[in-house]
Amino acid sequence: MSDYLVKGMAGEFIRFTGVSSRQTVEEARKRHNLSRLATAALGRALTATIILASDLKNPGDLLTLRIFGDGPLGGIVCSAGNDGMVRGYLFNPEVELPLNDANKLDVGRGIGKGHLYVTKDLGLKEPYTGTVQLVSGEIAEDVAYYLYYSEQRPNVFNLGVLVNPDGSVAQAGGCLIEILPGAPEEIISTLEQNLGEQQSLTYQLQQGKHIEEIIQEVVNPYKTEIYVKKPVGFLCSCSREKLLPHLIGLYSEVKDEEIVEAVCHFCREKYTFSGKEIKEYKEKNT
């Protein structure tokens, strides 16, 4: 099944967004040649970015998630619009660490201490950026903390990436469950109890459950109503035309017959330009 996103309500006071993202994360892994640890970290961030960007209202709006830590992975940058397409990269994609005490990939140690930034470009004069300190570096907790303290949105945020021994992605997904203002205390208690009884997100996906089924179990006995379902994936907006302006600084350094190679940070796509092409562009546009 292709990757997809669902959004909906459960009763009057629970709003949810869920994403199944295995193919998206696998595409990122292959493009960036990620280690197992880096796959888990970037995969969680890509999934979180899809979820956060799904609340954008207009086609041209853009959300960028940046995570900068002092751990060996360095940092992560991801961006997405409300169309479900995401792109992203990680500073040090080859880093690997020993498993943590729970025998899992140690994303928290890989990211370390630092800050999380969410920037929303809504076509206004200036983009809006909110920031919080990292809580754990595990990404889900950090995004949940951001939503609660920067946007006053009480929530449960769950992200998971299961990586095979050969490095390929077995499962990936995430869900955001929000408690709306005015919710009775018993709703919160019910969610807490249900969450405490659940297996991990990736375990349930590996057992064949769909993300909407997992969400239904979390919000039970409140019945879910899905009002959005759409495909998601890894897609970069880079092009030769967009990269060429960044090369005009080489104007005086390259000869006409020289070939310059440019690589997109977000997707590792390679583009080649001749010195003559760079010079002609500069002369026409400066």
From Swiss-Prot:
Main localization is: cytoplasm
Q: Does the keyword Ligase apply?
A: no
The record, for InterPro entries, names:
Heat_shock_Hsp33, Heat_shock_Hsp33_C, Heat_shock_Hsp33_N
Has UniProt tagged this entry with the keyword Transmembrane helix?
Answer: no
Top-level taxonomic group: Bacteria
Q: Which HAMAP family match?
A: HslO
Its protein name is 33 kDa chaperonin
Name the source organism: Carboxydothermus hydrogenoformans (strain ATCC BAA-161 / DSM 6008 / Z-2901)
